From Swiss-Prot:
Uppermost EC category: oxidoreductase
Top-level taxon of origin: Archaea
Enzyme Commission number, as recorded: 1.8.4.11
Protein's name according to its UniProt entry: Peptide methionine sulfoxide reductase MsrA
Keywords assigned: Oxidoreductase
Lineage summary: Archaea, Methanobacteriati, Methanobacteriota, Stenosarchaea group, Methanomicrobia
HAMAP family named among the record's database cross-references: MsrA
Pfam families on file: PMSR (PF01625)
Amino acid sequence: MAPEKSLERATFGAGCFWGVEEAFRRVPGVVETAVGFMGGTVENPTYPEVCTGRTGHAEVVQVTYDPGTVSYRALLDTFWDAHDPTTPNRQGPDIGTQYRSVIFVHTPEQEAEARASKEEMDQSGKFRRPIVTAIEPAGTFWRAEEYHQQYFAKRGGGQCRTVW
């Protein structure tokens, strides 16, 4: 594993975080994932609070990765492949603002790459509808309860829709 100082962080919201986390865990160069919440107004929200839709948070996966092994662009490709970025506030049967498609950027370089990648995906013809993914500055990451961490690895994936 690379020394910690050379690792970088990326944060993505793409629907139910259980399946999205598993998609990123499969990427070589990803050294750690954690699921949680970002983008809301309540400090240290719980899963039940976020599910009300009143906190403003999105379910997210925070990815720690070795940029010498995997590029941020490759992580963006995984993000686009893991969900339908054309549906606002919904992924499959999961409906609510917590399931929105969002890229939380940690650096100006990530923002530039995310915007370029979104434009390329929008122009690619892969999707019949426009991409609604938001690109926002990363805020505080609130780690979800432990039973949500690596949920698929612990329990299997029958409860969550993912596209991978």
